[in-house]
Amino acid sequence: MIQVLLVTICLAAFPYQGSSIILESGNVNDYEVVYARKVTALPKGAVQPKYEDTMQYELKVNGEPVVLHLEKNKQLFSKDYSETHYSPDGREITTYPPVEDHCYYHGRIENDADSTASISACNGLKGHFKLQGETYFIEPLKLPNSEAHAVFKYENVEKEDEVPKMCGVTQTNWESDEPIKKASQLVVTAEQQRYNHYKYIELVILADYRMVTKNNGDLGKIRTKIYEIVNILNEIFRYLYIRIALVGIEIWSNADLSNVTLSADDTLASFGTWRGTVLLKRKSHDNAQLLTAIDFDGQTIGIANIASMCNQNKSVGVVMDYSPINLVVAVIMAHEMGHNLGINHDTGSCSCGGYSCIMAPEISDQPSKLFSNCSKQAYQRYINYYKPQCILNEPLRTDIVSPPVCGNELLEMGEECDCGSPRNCRDPCCDAATCKLHSWVECESGECCDQCRFKGAGTECRAARSECDIAESCTGQSADCPTDDFKRNGQPCLHNYGYCYNGNCPIMYHQCYALFGSNATVAEDGCFEFNENGDKYFYCRKQSGVNIPCAQEDVKCGRLFCHTKKHPCDYKYSEDPDYGMVDNGTKCADGKVCSNGHCVDVATAY
């Protein structure tokens, strides 16, 4: 018999108004105090693991009771996970620590379908959860003989008043610089577009010597930070059907093994070369990210090679340890890995339902865990075009568990599924006794799969995102939603204020809204004449690194000008050459759209 015991958090809901406290996450000026008491729920007589597979907590947030459900992230580590550091005389020291009974969880809030959670339960509860659309952080208070925790919002963490930080990627596209009609002519098969089937990235994270000195030589603190970051990465990338397996970390505890300089570009190039010539020879993996404590020149906090996943010297990124809040660093790393997966920076016409999206070139006031519609489309195109083999297939498990053991919840050679023991199996498609799919199973996952069977023909599987898009429906013969299609490019939309372009209706008003907020409108025509200057800020396009001035008829296809409370000719500029420019496909005159810095007839543009 299973003895079910509640896990309770008793809350004293009294925010310390006007006071502040120094936590690992920084100086917090408004928080609530939570007292946690945990009791396990196990079969009678069972050996209690240090950290249970599932846990439940009851707590109050803003005086309202909530129930937090947590489930251990069993796919966080690969079974051949290793850790490497270096002795003072430079000797490589590699260990293979046991990681099965780890303390990193994902979760949700009961009765809140949009909720998420990423929590470390190693020493109290540390992490974040999303409740009713708002993100809260929880962290243990360092009080003697106390189980007190602080609950607070990101906005209550004091931040330095500094210029906005940016991604250092300036390459605008991994595809050829062809006319914009190329995107509308993409043709992919149903098999090629199976981007919604899970991919697996085997990740190695390296910490440079500055990370060691920043943390006073405490390698355990660096390891914990990396674990929490990767746990968050898994939460983020599941929306792209990607799982991140940490196969190793390496800490340059004695000296940097590649050049880490103030130049982010040089650091990336050196790290990529070292990864391809040294690291890959001793540790199999798909992607490597360098976590550094250096403060790069300019506004850069991260950089990566675009469309480079699986490439020997280029499947890398460099991320600055910009914040003590691990969610912020994880979002930066997710951004750079997004570039590795062929995703470019978001423009004004991209949206994710939040204030900002992961691939925004400038770090947001509120860290976002959401990829935009543009990011999802770019990732799908990349998968279809490049077919990066190292992530298309689930990693072989021969190096993880051998021989295969049915019932251990690991999919191994010879198994079609593995949902655990017959008592614990929750997968209706899987026969837990044999680790084979039931004979009647038609599918396991996909937008057109429900309870192991294909959804009926005509069932909508992808809603139209705009009047320029087309809703897709299941065929009844496949688990996959048909290829994302959209209305003909150049068709008028939004009451003739714009023309359809790849399923969207890009107009300047929406782009101003995205850049400056709801009070912004499109500036007067005279503002756009600045684009004839061809200087650092105002131009139509770049050619061989040179800013090309706009011809008079093209001025509305260069820098975007918006009327704001601050200025009638307001604009945005950053190191990213696309940021703040008028989006391709935007109406620039009656019957004309922007195409690579030119205002051309809509009939010839597509």
Swiss-Prot record:
Prosequence residues removed at maturation: 21-190
Binding site residues for Ca(2+) 2: V405, N408, L410, E412, E415, D418
Motif D/ECD-tripeptide mapped to chain: 467-469
Gene Ontology MF, one: metalloendopeptidase activity
Intrachain S-S bonds: C310-C390, C350-C374, C352-C357, C406-C435, C417-C430, C419-C425, C429-C452, C443-C449, C448-C474, C461-C481, C468-C500, C493-C505, C512-C562, C527-C569, C540-C550, C557-C594, C588-C599
Recorded superkingdom: Eukaryota
Enzyme class: hydrolase
Tissue specificity comment: Expressed by the venom gland.
Residues of the active site: E336
Protein residues bound to Zn(2+): H335, H339, H345
Misc. comment: The disintegrin domain belongs to the long disintegrin subfamily.
UniProt subunit comment: Monomer.
Family from the record: Belongs to the venom metalloproteinase (M12B) family. P-III subfamily. P-IIIa sub-subfamily.
Name of the protein in its database record: Zinc metalloproteinase-disintegrin-like HF3
Organism: Bothrops jararaca (Jararaca)
